[in-house]
A protein has these predicted regions:
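Bacterial Sec-dependent N-terminal signal peptides
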Residues: 1-25
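Surface-exposed binding patches on compact interaction domains or structured appendages
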Residues: 25-47, 70-144, 152
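Short, solvent-exposed loop/turn segments enriched in Ser/Thr/Gly
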Residues: 47, 58-64, 140-141, 153-160
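Short edge beta-strand/loop segments characteristic of extracellular beta-sandwich folds
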Residues: 64-68, 145-147
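Aromatic-lined carbohydrate-binding surfaces of glycoside hydrolases
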Residues: 114-115, 122-127, 131, 138, ...
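Catalytic domains of carbohydrate-active enzymes that cleave complex glycans
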Residues: 312-377, 382-398, 486-577
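Active-site clefts of carbohydrate-active enzymes
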Residues: 429-458
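Substrate-binding cleft of secreted/luminal carbohydrate-active enzymes
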Residues: 453-503
C-alpha cells in the first residue's frame, strides 16, 4: 500500500511537471475556423475545424486561422510558405489580419440571426500590411486568400502558413497546415450583374486615401486612386460601374448653345474596362429630389455661373462650379432644362456609338422614386427614351405599379421584390430585366450585408438572385467612408445607418483594404455561377440546391455545415463527365 502511494505520488508529480513544462512552452494555439464564421474578440473556446476548403478553378480559396495566445505576442506576421499537390503548386497566396470595428448602436428591427457582441466590436476589415500583437488569452483571426484560375491543376493541395512573433525578447515561429481541394470545374465570366456604388468622385472620399490631404479632381493621383478602386472591384466580381455623364463632362455655353467634352468620362470607363469591371456602364443619375423625400424630381442642368443661377437649387455635384458653369436643379418642364436635355442626350448618344459603348450603357434617372413623386420620374423617363433611344433605364425603386412603362431594368429593394413578386414576374414576361438591391433596409429577417449579420447571409444575397431569377444586384455603399473609418463607430450618423451599410471596403494610404464581408459577397457571386452551371445540366437539381439554402425571401439555412454540404454536392455534381 505504501509502495502504491509512493508510485501514485511520483506519477502525480511527473504528470504535473510535464503539464507545467507543456504549458510553459506552449505559447500559442492555432485553430482553423470556417471563414463564414465571424470570430468575436470575446470568444475563448475553439475546436480545430480542419475541414478541406473546396473550390472550383477560378474561385478564391479562403482560410481562416485563429491565433490564441497564452502569453503576450508582439509584431505577429504571417506568410504562406507553400501550397502543393505533387508537382503542382499554388502561387499568389496573401495573408491579412482581421481587424475589428466598433458598433455603437445595433439596428432595429433585428434579424433572428443577429450576432450580439459583448465587447461591441465585430470582425470586418482585412489588414495585410501591418503586424498585429495580442495580450495573454487574446485571440486574433488571420485571413488567407489563395487565388486559382482556369489553368490550376485539380487535386488536393496541402498548404502551410508560418506565423512569427516576439515573445519576450525572442522571435518565435508557429506553423499550421491546411488543405484545399481544387475541383475540375472552371468558372467563366460571371453572368450576374453586380454594382456597389463608389464615392470616389468626391474629393473628401479620396482624401481618406491620402492621409486626409486633398486630391485634385482629374490629377494623376486622382486617376491612380481610381485605378486602385477598379482593380479591387474587378477582383471581387463587380462588373457594372456607375459613372456620372453630367458630372464628368466639360462644358462651354454660349447664347443657349452647349459644347461637350466627354474625355474624362471616357478615361474612367477605360480604366474599369481594362481590368474587366465594365460589362455594363451604369450612367449616374440625371435628376434629384427637389426637396423632401416625396417631392418631385428636378433635372440637373449646367448653366452659366452668375447671380441668377446662384439662386437656383444646387446640384449634389461635388464641383458645384467648373469652367464658368454652375450645376443646378430645374423642373424638367423648365425651358432651360429642355434646352440642355435636347442637346446633351443626342450628343452623348452619338459619342457612345463612336466608342462602341452604346449597347453596354444603361441610364439612371433618379434614385428610389416613391408613389408620390413617380409622375415627375415618368416625365423625365419619357425624355430619356426619346433622346437616348435603345438605352435602358434602370433605377432602384421603392414602389412598383406607379412606374410601369418608365423603367427597363427594375431594381426593387428586396422586400418590395418579395411583396410584389407577381408584378415583377409579369414584367419579366414583357422582356424587362429584374435585379434587386439592399441598403439601410430591408431589416428584420432579410439578408443584407450588415456587420451584425452572419457572413452566410451576405453570401446568400446571390443565392436569392438565383432562386428568384434576379439577374443583378445593387448596393449604394462601396466606400462612403467617414474620417478614420477603421476606428470609427461603424453605425454611421448617430445610428441611422446599420453598421456596414456605408462601406464594404476600407481606406489605407493610397491603398484599399477588403473585408470579410466583401470576400463573402464575391464567393456568393461565384456560387450563382455554379448554380447556373448546374442548371444547364439539370434544372431540377439546381432548384433543389437553391431551395436547400433559401427557404423564402427572408428565411434561410443558418447552418454553415449544411451550406458547406450543399456546396460540396454542387462541385461533386459538376465534376462528373
Amino acid at each position: 500500500m505504501i509502495m502504491i502511494k509512493k508510485w501514485s505520488l511520483f506519477f502525480l508529480l511527473f504528470i504535473t511537471s510535464v503539464f507545467y513544462m507543456f504549458s510553459k512552452d506552449k505559447q500559442v494555439y492555432l485553430y482553423q475556423v470556417d471563414p463564414l464564421i465571424k470570430v468575436l474578440k470575446e470568444r475563448n473556446y475553439f475546436r480545430d475545424e480542419t475541414d478541406t476548403i473546396r473550390v472550383a478553378r477560378g474561385e478564391v480559396a479562403s482560410v481562416q486561422i485563429v491565433v490564441q495566445g497564452l502569453t503576450e505576442i508582439r509584431n505577429m506576421q504571417a506568410t504562406v510558405t507553400h501550397i502543393s499537390s505533387g508537382l503542382s503548386k499554388l502561387a499568389g497566396a496573401t495573408t491579412g489580419w482581421v481587424g475589428y470595428v466598433r458598433v455603437g448602436r445595433s439596428y432595429n428591427p433585428p434579424s433572428k440571426d443577429i450576432i450580439r457582441s459583448v465587447s461591441g466590436y465585430f470582425p470586418d476589415p482585412i489588414i495585410p500590411d501591418s503586424a498585429f500583437s495580442i495580450k495573454p488569452g487574446e485571440i486574433q483571426p488571420l485571413w488567407i486568400s489563395i487565388p486559382t484560375d482556369a489553368a490550376t491543376v485539380p487535386g488536393l493541395y496541402k498548404g502551410t502558413v508560418e506565423i512569427t512573433g516576439e515573445v519576450g525578447k525572442k522571435k518565435k515561429a508557429w506553423y499550421k497546415e491546411f488543405y484545399i481541394r481544387i475541383y475540375p470545374v472552371t468558372l467563366g465570366k460571371s453572368p450576374l450583374y453586380i454594382t456597389n456604388w463608389s464615392a470616389h468622385f468626391n474629393p473628401v472620399t479620396l482624401s481618406y486615401l491620402n492621409n486626409n490631404n486633398p486630391v485634385e479632381a482629374y490629377s494623376p493621383l486622382y486617376w491612380e486612386l481610381i485605378g486602385i478602386h477598379a482593380k479591387l472591384m474587378a477582383s471581387h466580381r463587380q462588373n457594372v460601374h456607375r459613372i456620372y455623364p453630367i458630372w464628368h463632362t466639360l462644358y462651354t455655353y454660349n447664347d443657349g448653345k452647349y459644347t461637350f467634352d466627354f474625355s474624362r468620362f471616357d478615361k474612367e470607363a477605360e480604366i474599369f474596362d481594362a481590368v474587366g469591371a465594365l460589362e455594363r456602364i451604369e450612367g449616374g443619375h440625371l435628376a434629384w429630389r427637389s426637396g423632401a423625400w416625396d417631392d418631385p424630381f428636378f433635372v440637373e442642368v449646367p448653366l452659366p455661373d452668375n447671380e441668377e443661377t446662384a439662386q437656383l437649387r444646387v446640384s449634389p455635384n461635388p464641383k458645384k462650379v467648373e469652367n464658368g458653369i454652375r450645376f443646378t436643379l430645374l423642373p424638367v418642364e423648365d425651358e432651360r432644362a429642355k434646352n440642355f436635355i435636347t442637346q446633351f442626350l443626342p450628343a452623348f448618344k452619338q459619342h457612345l456609338e463612336q466608342r462602341g459603348w452604346l449597347d453596354r450603357y444603361m441610364q439612371h434617372i433618379a434614385d428610389e422614386p416613391t408613389a408620390k413623386n413617380a409622375s415627375s420620374y415618368v416625365t423625365i423617363s419619357n425624355y430619356i427614351h426619346e433622346f437616348l433611344p435603345g438605352v435602358k433605364v434602370l433605377d432602384a425603386v421603392l414602389t412598383s405599379k406607379e412606374l410601369a412603362g418608365a423603367i427597363d431594368i427594375w431594381v426593387p429593394v428586396l422586400n418590395v421584390l418579395h411583396n410584389d413578386y407577381a408584378f415583377y414576374q409579369d414584367l419579366k414576361k414583357e422582356g424587362k430585366e429584374i435585379w434587386f438591391y439592399t441598403c439601410v433596409g430591408p431589416r428584420g429577417n432579410y439578408a443584407n450585408r450588415f456587420i451584425e449579420l452572419p457572413l452566410n447571409q451576405t453570401r446568400y444575397l446571390h443565392w436569392i438572385n438565383y432562386k428568384y431569377d434576379a439577374t443583378g444586384y445593387l448596393h449604394w455603399g462601396l466606400n462612403y467612408w467617414v474620417e478614420d473609418q477603421l476606428n470609427a463607430d461603424a453605425s454611421r450618423d448617430r445610428g441611422r445607418l446599420p453598421a456596414g451599410d456605408n462601406c464594404i471596403i476600407y481606406p489605407g494610404y493610397r491603398k484599399l483594404y477588403s473585408s470579410i464581408r466583401f470576400e463573402a459577397m464575391r464567393d456568393g457571386i461565384d456560387d450563382y455561377q455554379l448554380l447556373k452551371m448546374v442548371e444547364r445540366k439539370d434544372e431540377k437539381r439546381a432548384k433543389r440546391y437553391a431551395d436547400a439554402i433559401i427557404f423564402n425571401f427572408n428565411d434561410y439555412e443558418a447552418s454553415v455545415t449544411s451550406f458547406r454540404s450543399v456546396r460540396k454536392q454542387i462541385l461533386d455534381f459538376l465534376s462528373q463527365p
